[in-house]
Regions:
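An N-cap/entry alpha-helix motif that binds or orients negatively charged groups
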Residues: 1-62
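Conserved, mostly hydrophobic/aromatic
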Residues: 9, 49, 74, 82, ...
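Active-site beta-loop-alpha junctions enriched in small/polar residues
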Residues: 12, 50-54, 87, 114, ...
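N-terminal active-site wall of soluble small-molecule enzyme domains
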Residues: 46, 59-108, 112-159, 165-170, ...
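Catalytic cores of alpha/beta
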Residues: 116-128, 164-174, 211-233, 247
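Glycine-rich phosphate-binding active-site loops on the catalytic face of alpha/beta enzymes
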Residues: 126-143, 180-188, 228-247
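Catalytic-face loop-and-helix region of soluble metabolic enzyme cores
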Residues: 178-187, 192-225
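C-terminal helical cap(s) of enzyme catalytic domains, especially alpha/beta-barrels
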Residues: 196-203, 239-255
Length: 255
């Protein structure tokens, strides 16, 4: 994996944005607030389940998957939200996957992409997303704040992704209410759950926190449960032969 993966993907995103048209803004799909839902679920660790056919770190994960059936299983198993990869080049996703899944389920859906422009946000909303991802490492603080405010004004919720303390401070500073801690370093692609554990002492009481990446086992979920409201899990579920059982295994009671 290239040491400058993030910069490589951001250059690709700039090229994609240049080709995007200005879509008229539609209404946000009706569902519950992810923030409100996670705030109320104090006794159980929730799961954000991901539809991800491939990734730069793992290669092809499950290319033949029926994404709508996978989404149906996620919702039936009690997922808090479904994350859908919309990046085509690096993750073999598609905005049409987001549209298909959002049309099918009643729970929130997350547009999982490297968002750098308002046009991407509008496209995600129009495809049925109720939550978008903004990555602190991908944007200047000023630009992050602009896109955060833009999405919020449209009625979307925003998952702001961090990886270290300085990024967490930025997420807090811009007023993010749903904050992700990515255990994967987007420069080197190395994964460590210690990232989540190290940042947990700096969490604020009026926000919700999601641990992302590298989560495969009940033991790992138990380790993270005291500090996080939810886990974002993709590869473990995409490779599982029993999705419902895997969701149950990771959606543990919080002691």
């Amino acid at each position: 994996m290239s040491q400058d993966f993030l910069q490589t993907i951001l250059k690709q995103k700039e090229a994609e944005v240049a080709q995007l048209v200005n879509e008229p803004v539609e209404s946000v799909r009706s569902t519950y607030s992810l923030f409100d839902f996670l705030t109320k679920q104090k006794d159980q660790l929730q799961l954000i389940t991901e539809v991800k056919k491939a990734s730069p770190s793992m290669g092809d994960i499950n290319l033949t998957l029926d994404i709508t059936e996978q989404a149906r299983q996620y919702e039936a198993a009690g997922a808090a939200m479904i994350s859908v990869l919309t990046d085509q080049i690096f993750f073999k996703g598609d905005v049409q996957f987001l549209r298909q899944i959002s049309d099918l389920v009643s729970i929130p859906t997350l547009a999982k992409d490297f968002i750098i422009d308002e046009k991407q946000i509008i496209r995600s909303l129009n495809a049925g997303a109720t939550v978008i991802l903004l990555i602190v490492a991908a944007l200047s603080e000023d630009r992050l704040k602009e896109l955060f405010k833009f999405a919020t004004r449209l009625g979307l919720e925003v998952l702001v992704e961090t990886h270290n303390l300085s990024e967490l401070d930025i997420a807090h500073r811009i007023g993010a209410k749903i904050i992700g801690v990515n255990n994967r370093n987007l420069t080197t692609f190395e994964v460590s759950l210690q990232t989540s554990l190290d940042l947990a002492p700096h969490f604020l009481p009026d926000r919700v926190y999601v641990s992302e990446s590298g989560i495969f086992t009940n033991e790992q979920a138990e380790l993270l449960a005291p500090y996080f409201h939810a886990l974002l899990v993709g590869t473990a579920l995409m490779q599982s032969e029993d999705v419902a059982q895997k969701v149950k295994e990771l959606s543990i009671e919080k002691g």
